[in-house]
């Protein structure tokens, strides 16, 4: 019998969440963000589910893009961090990849490049996040230099990233959009600013292309505490199995460091998932988990390959019963909130030893 640490990936949920993005921005084209191995869901798995539904894919670098091309995907692919070195330009031309250009050296490299075919580029504007991109006062000159490069296609796009859109009450997003619009004023070409939070919460950010990311995987992009949340379907169920049921006495400690002790005589389940599977070691006692279809909580510290759960008040649980760490009744956002992190990190930190198993239906 295998250890059974696995993550089922619901292809129907991925497509349903993309339809939610489409409904929020019906006039725009969709650049589905599938970087970081499809947010941990599997790059080719996610691309396969969304082929024919998104107009383009966005990944981090040429390695991810070339993997998609090798797997047969012909959609437009945008490299969100652009070229990391001059030789990435030839790779982009060979694989028909689109480049986000955010630095002067990239502009100069394109000006001097002799490529087998021209490339499409997106000029990144630093509208206020201060991570990558050209300051607003440099955008016009950078655009002019790109138009003079013989290896750059004429339809240069403009792109920015929103730093605070996850808080629908933060005025920083409006300021960023004003900065972006002013920086690109009078220049032709498509615009893109909306991440998942922009798609769902900031219609003014939609422009020509939207870039849904975390929402495709069923997690809310918002952190502002408003009651209204998007109706998104979790695409991943992270699952293990109960490998032991222990009947402990009042006062018995559980796990490393004896940080948690049984308040009464009680059953405790041991589940075959640990921090070696990407589950956060710092998850506190009380973090929600589903066991045998019933909601309960963690007790004690997380081990490398195991964790313990409270079985009090549940219908009988037996060895071999399923445990779902997130997905189903327990959302990844709940686990992330208990751990002081975000769902993005939970998805992306999952290692290869956790099997990804695509399913195409309503049941995870």
From Swiss-Prot:
The keyword NADP does not apply. The active site is at residues 35, 256. SUPFAM superfamilies: Alanine racemase C-terminal domain-like, PLP-binding barrel. Substrate binds at residues 131, 304. Pathway: Amino-acid biosynthesis; D-alanine biosynthesis; D-alanine from L-alanine: step 1/1. It catalyses: L-alanine = D-alanine. Keywords: Isomerase, Pyridoxal phosphate. GO terms for biological process: D-alanine biosynthetic process. GO terms for cellular component: cytosol. Its cofactor is pyridoxal 5'-phosphate. Its EC number is 5.1.1.1. The keyword DNA-binding does not apply. GO terms for molecular function: alanine racemase activity; pyridoxal phosphate binding. Belongs to the alanine racemase family. NCBIfam families: alr. Catalyzes the interconversion of L-alanine and D-alanine. May also act on other amino acids. This is Alanine racemase. It comes from Halorhodospira halophila (strain DSM 244 / SL1).
């Amino acid at each position: 019998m295998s250890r059974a640490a696995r993550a089922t990936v619901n292809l129907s949920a991925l497509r349903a969440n993309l339809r939610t993005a489409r409904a929020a921005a019906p006039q725009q084209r969709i650049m589905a963000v599938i970087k970081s191995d499809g947010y941990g869901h599997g790059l080719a798995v996610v691309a396969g589910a969304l082929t024919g539904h998104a107009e383009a894919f966005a990944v981090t670098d040429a390695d991810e893009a070339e993997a998609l091309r090798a797997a047969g995907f012909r959609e437009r692919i945008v490299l969100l961090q652009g070229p990391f070195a001059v030789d990435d330009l030839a790779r982009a031309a060979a694989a028909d990849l689109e480049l986000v250009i955010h630095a002067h050296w990239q502009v100069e490299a394109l000006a001097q490049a002799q490529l087998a075919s021209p490339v499409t580029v997106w000029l990144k504007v630093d509208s206020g996040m201060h991570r990558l991109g050209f300051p607003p006062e440099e955008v016009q000159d950078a655009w002019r230099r790109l138009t003079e490069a013989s290896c750059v296609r004429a339809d240069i796009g403009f792109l920015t990233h929103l730093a605070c859109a996850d808080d629908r009450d933060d005025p920083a997003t409006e300021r960023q959009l004003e900065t972006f619009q002013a920086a690109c004023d009078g220049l032709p070409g498509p615009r893109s600013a909306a991440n998942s939070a922009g798609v769902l919460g900031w219609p003014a950010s939609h422009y020509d292309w939207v870039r849904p990311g975390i929402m495709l995987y069923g997690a809310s992009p918002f952190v502002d505490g408003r009651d209204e949340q998007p109706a998104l379907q979790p695409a991943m169920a992270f699952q293990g199995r109960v490998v032991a049921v222990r009947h402990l006495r009042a006062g018995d400690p559980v796990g490393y460091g004896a940080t948690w002790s049984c308040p009464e005589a009680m059953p405790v389940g041991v589940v075959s998932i640990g921090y070696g599977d990407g589950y956060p070691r710092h998850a506190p006692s009380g973090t929600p988990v589903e066991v045998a279809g019933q909601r309960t909580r963690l007790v004690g510290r997380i081990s490398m390959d195991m964790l313990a759960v409270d079985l009090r008040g549940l219908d009988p649980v037996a060895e071999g019963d399923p445990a779902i760490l997130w997905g189903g009744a327990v959302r990844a956002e709940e686990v992330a909130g208990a751990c002081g992190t975000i769902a993005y990190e939970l998805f992306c930190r999952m290692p290869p030893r956790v099997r990804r198993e695509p399913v195409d239906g309503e049941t995870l």
